[in-house]
Amino acid sequence: MRTGSMLRTISDSAIRDQAASTLSGKPRRWSWTAFFGPALIAAVAYIDPGNFATNIEAGSRYGYTLLWVVLAANLMAMLIQTLSARLGLATGQNLPQVIRARYPRPLVWCYWVQAEIVAIATDLAEFLGAALAFHLLFGLSLMEGALLTGTITYLALHLYRYGFRLMEILIGAMILAVAGGFILELVLSRPEPAPLLKGLLIPGFPDGYALYLAAGILGATVMPHVIYLHSALSQQRIQVKDDAHRLRLMRYYRLDVILGMAIAGLVNLSMLAMAAAVFHATGRLDVATISDSYLLLAPVVGQVTASHVFGLALLLAGLSSSIVGTLSGQVIMQGFVNVSIPLWLRRLVTMLPALAVIMLGISEQKALVASQVILSFGIPFALVPLLCFTANRQIMGNLVNRKSVTGVGTVVCTLIVALNVYVLFSTFTGH
């Protein structure tokens, strides 16, 4: 009986009722929690295995110096995800649907193809990260880890048929576990407070490679597929009755984004600071792979718990981000070309590149780098339309961006695109 009562309180209809009562000025106890969830799902993409690789290398090579980059990237992510939620709420459509309605059909098909490629490349990194975690923690082969990852993520995706709230609870539990794990890692590593605060608050680049890593941190933080996804998730809570309700709902969504991105930011800051305290401080400046980090943590920190917690955090981050990647792929296909395929089929298709990488014996580190390069191509295609649409009063109505928000968004968008062009140029030229 208690189980049935609990399930009723977390059902989609119950969440919608709680949200409606709060927006109508008749909040129930804890009814404000009904608005929290979409940004937690989006936040998972900001702590995927690609972030592990860039944060660890930045911390081991430059200590705390690039902490400010992580903080700045997180603030940019807050703005971008807020705009995505705002677009979905104002239009009742996700970003791909708005693009489909307003762009020429040939261009829409090009958008769809690049978005699918970026989503698959992103899922490659997430999938390999989870498979690598199974290998490090339990001694499984990468192929066994990959097959286990595919099975677990498929079973988790099966929950979505029972409603969005169960999925939000599952993903939320995973991201909170990852955050708890890295807070523990930070405590075990005993960082120096003064250099940590200096790196967090004082911008600077020690050399040219630091700029390259900073661009990599930003590229691993801003994820096109969750920009598409978040605009879809913001429509699920409640059908708003009028403009006043819509504005009130947007305030809650803004808080949701702040909470979700703050958790993701805490994870990334803890990750880089841990690498700085454990590796840079002991002269290990060349730790650049996830495997090296796992193997060196226990000997340096002096506790085997450190390695196990790191491996478990990697596993949960890989699994949860792979789940979110599959959901994003559904939104991308449905939005751009108005076609849906079963989740199991999408899960199978997006597994194939990871399985091919493992069978061909390609280094997981090289695959992660390649996935980040492909990701860099897709960022402008999501950011530019998002900024243009949310600044258009005909599309957004009373949720249109203020001029100041559009101005800041333009600066952020230009900076992100420029840094990603720099990463691509540096990668292909070898500089």
From Swiss-Prot:
InterPro entries given in the database record: NRAMP_fam
GO cellular component, one term: plasma membrane
Location of this chain's protein in the cell: Cell inner membrane
GO biological process: one example: iron ion transmembrane transport
UniProt GO MF annotations: cadmium ion transmembrane transporter activity; manganese ion transmembrane transporter activity; metal ion binding; symporter activity
Keywords (A to Z) from UniProt: Cell inner membrane, Cell membrane, Ion transport, Membrane, Symport, Transmembrane, Transmembrane helix, Transport
Residues annotated as transmembrane: 30-50, 63-83, 106-126, 137-159, 169-189, 209-229, 257-277, 287-307, 309-329, 341-361, 367-387, 405-425
Main localization of the protein described in the UniProt heading: membrane
Membrane topology annotation: Multi-pass membrane protein
Similarity comment text for this entry: Belongs to the NRAMP family.
NCBIfam families attached to this UniProt entry: nramp, Nramp_1, PRK00701.1
Role description: H(+)-stimulated, divalent metal cation uptake system.
PANTHER family membership: NATURAL RESISTANCE-ASSOCIATED MACROPHAGE PROTEIN 2, SOLUTE CARRIER PROTEIN FAMILY 11 MEMBER
Name of the protein: Divalent metal cation transporter MntH
Organism encoding this protein: Chromohalobacter salexigens (strain ATCC BAA-138 / DSM 3043 / CIP 106854 / NCIMB 13768 / 1H11)
